[in-house]
From Swiss-Prot:
Gene3D superfamilies hit by this protein: P-loop containing nucleotide triphosphate hydrolases
Regulation: Alternates between an inactive form bound to GDP and an active form bound to GTP. Activated by a guanine nucleotide-exchange factor (GEF) and inactivated by a GTPase-activating protein (GAP). Interaction with SOS1 promotes exchange of bound GDP to GTP.
Protein name in UniProt: GTPase KRas
Post-translational modification remark: Acetylation at Lys-104 prevents interaction with guanine nucleotide exchange factors (GEFs).
Removed propeptide positions: 187-189
One GO cellular component term noted in the UniProt record for this chain: cytoplasm
Any single Pfam family the record assigns to this protein: Ras
Keyword Transmembrane: no
Catalysed reaction equations from the record: GTP + H2O = GDP + phosphate + H(+)
Entry function: Ras proteins bind GDP/GTP and possess intrinsic GTPase activity. Plays an important role in the regulation of cell proliferation. Plays a role in promoting oncogenic events by inducing transcriptional silencing of tumor suppressor genes (TSGs) in colorectal cancer (CRC) cells in a ZNF304-dependent manner.
Residues recorded with modification Cysteine methyl ester: 186
Subunit and partners: Interacts with PHLPP. Interacts (active GTP-bound form preferentially) with RGS14. Interacts (when farnesylated) with PDE6D; this promotes dissociation from the cell membrane. Interacts with SOS1. Interacts (when farnesylated) with GPR31. Interacts with RAP1GDS1. Interacts (active GTP-bound form) with both SHOC2 and PP1c (all isoforms) to form a tertiary complex; SHOC2 and PP1c preferably bind M-Ras/MRAS, but they also bind K-Ras/KRAS, N-Ras/NRAS and H-Ras/HRAS. Interacts (GTP-bound form) with MAPKAP1/SIN1; inhibiting K-Ras/KRAS activity.
Length: 189
């Protein structure tokens, strides 16, 4: 069974935990309890393939920012979440993306931009703005509601598909590189 390491990032209070718990446990948590770091595992079938999702739900609060590098190193794909009623959380996405690229030392990291809380009438981030940002990053954009479960699965499953494409690209690039021999080094003590 293929395992996918997904990391949910974004500012505090945007609904990262609510999205994750909605996917894992099928219920909405409406009380806000700031996360330090929680890990969840769920077996799902995506496009006919049985997968194990290893989801890391992270702290949005600045006081935990020192922990970010560590979980960004281990993650394969990132859900970059903002709240559609919080412009600052949308502006913060740029910082998360830059940090991910720096830690992964790559321009090409599987990501999905997620605009959460689309059930709320008090929108401050226009859908077009978010679509344009996602297009400029070359990543998908999905609006979700953790409360109503709208497109929650879609967000996570789209990220898995992005990781699959990334893995395939990486394999074909390695096969096309002429004269490259993988050398594995072992140290026996």
């Amino acid at each position: 069974m293929t395992e996918y390491k997904l990391v949910v990032v974004g500012a505090g209070g945007v609904g990262k935990s609510a999205l994750t718990i909605q996917l894992i446990q099928n219920h909405f948590v409406d009380e806000y309890d700031p996360t330090i770091e929680d890990s969840y595992r769920k077996q799902v079938v995506i496009d006919g393939e049985t997968c194990l999702l290893d989801i890391l739900d992270t702290a949005g609060q600045e006081e935990y920012s020192a922990m970010r590098d560590q979980y960004m190193r281990t993650g394969e794909g990132f859900l970059c979440v903002f709240a559609i009623n919080n412009t600052k959380s949308f502006e913060d996405i740029h910082h998360y993306r830059e940090q991910i690229k720096r830690v992964k030392d790559s321009e090409d990291v599987p990501m999905v931009l997620v605009g959460n809380k689309c059930d709320l009438p008090s929108r401050t981030v226009d859908t077009k703005q978010a679509q344009e940002l996602a297009r400029s990053y070359g990543i998908p954009f999905i609006e979700t509601s953790a409360k109503t479960r709208q497109r929650v699965e879609d967000a996570f499953y789209t990220l898995v598909r992005e990781i699959r494409q990334y893995r395939l690209k990486k394999i074909s690039k390695e096969e096309k590189t002429p004269g490259c021999v993988k050398i594995k080094k072992c140290v026996i003590m």
